[in-house]
């Protein structure tokens, strides 16, 4: 936030002249009551407490010097026992326009990450069926976080973990093989746990067409052929759906790689070297309770088979070994109990838990005509992500998935998202940008063109609504910084809703092109250009287009 940075610089200079240094507990914040000014600080109270003097006296000295030495403040007042309330001058806020337009598409970016190498793993759905809308939410959040962290100075790599070695994959092969038998006229009994979706039938038909003699295979060979064919078909479908959704993974890491390279056994040996494993009843255990887990965890069972937890440890061990400074996992909410144990394992290897973030994605309920659509992959009764995308569009789907905090339940209302009204959040925001573009085109046709914003007289930007818009535009840098720091892309969607609301309200009061004064038209056009640039930058981070026409 430019205003906060500027105020802090001025305060540091002022208190230095008074013989003081910036105290650790001093804060600058936005007052809850806007009548108290743009910013407030407790610096006088903290200084007074540290050196044992009257806070009101020192607050008055700071206020006097601030106003003497800078024209950027229209008022600096002392409130209560020694709080300082600061209101910036219109001239200060007007410069926000120049700042934004000079920065352009980089406005809001920063070097928070300092080129730190980050690996974000997301979606990682079992290749046992098409992606559904729950996966879509994780995809939107993961991809947006990657964009956001790159925008704030991180070196980001994105990864999809292919669960291709577990029981679910075995069931996929068995399900397809059984369908092949059924399609070939053989009577079969269908176990409850097998996959029953129509996509299984389509895969079986495709495999029969490609390999007509497959029905002559033994069950073992038929199941294996079905598994490999089915997994490739489904995985290719997943990749295509993600591409359509504007989601890209740079790395596709196969679980089978861990087995083929003996990475699991190597990881377990490394863990044993930490002294945090033990043998009990023929099984190998990890002392995860040392790091706060509620119980110790089995790594290798008494029958010598490995647990899923052992595979997960090996996978995450490779993440750090590949040179990443920070690991981010985006998982379904059903993984809540998994967090403590996997973090404990990484701590056992000496990794700081602050370098490992796990974001949980809560469920999505699809509403159609006000009724919730039930979803179950096993039964084949689920809403495919691609169907939702085809119905509402990529932009609408992404924006809606990002509208709420990731660990909050989300109702996805199909009818609302398809509406071209102000009740539809994504339409509300995109229309704000399109409206600005339309005004600028009309202005150009009327002979109003801004070639250099520094030549535009911005002193006309003085109304309460205009200054509120500028305050909100100045806040964008803070929104991006905080969204990246807290891994919270919903901060951006909420900000966009607020900014779009201010823009629509402003235009209703001040039809930009209807003023008789050229300088007013040009200054307001510059303001709209700045608003448009911020909306564009924010939507770009979300992976949502900023349409010039609607």
Curated annotation (Swiss-Prot):
Disulfide bonds: none annotated. GO terms for molecular function: arginine-tRNA ligase activity; ATP binding. A motif ('HIGH' region) lies at residues 125-135. The keyword tRNA processing does not apply. It holds the Pfam family Arg_tRNA_synt_N. Its main location: cytoplasm. InterPro entries: aa-tRNA-synth_I_CS (IPR001412), Arg-tRNA-ligase (IPR001278), Arg-tRNA-synth_N (IPR005148), Arg-tRNA-synth_N_sf (IPR036695), ArgRS_core (IPR035684), DALR_anticod-bd (IPR008909), Rossmann-like_a/b/a_fold (IPR014729), tRNAsynth_Ia_anticodon-bd (IPR009080). Gene3D superfamilies: Arginyl tRNA synthetase N-terminal domain, HUPs, Isoleucyl-tRNA Synthetase, Domain 1. GO terms for biological process: arginyl-tRNA aminoacylation. It is found in: Cytoplasm. It catalyses: tRNA(Arg) + L-arginine + ATP = L-arginyl-tRNA(Arg) + AMP + diphosphate. GO terms for cellular component: cytoplasm. Its EC number is 6.1.1.19. Keywords: Aminoacyl-tRNA synthetase, ATP-binding, Cytoplasm, Ligase, Nucleotide-binding, Protein biosynthesis. Monomer. Belongs to the class-I aminoacyl-tRNA synthetase family. HAMAP family: Arg_tRNA_synth. This is Arginine--tRNA ligase. It comes from Lawsonia intracellularis (strain PHE/MN1-00).
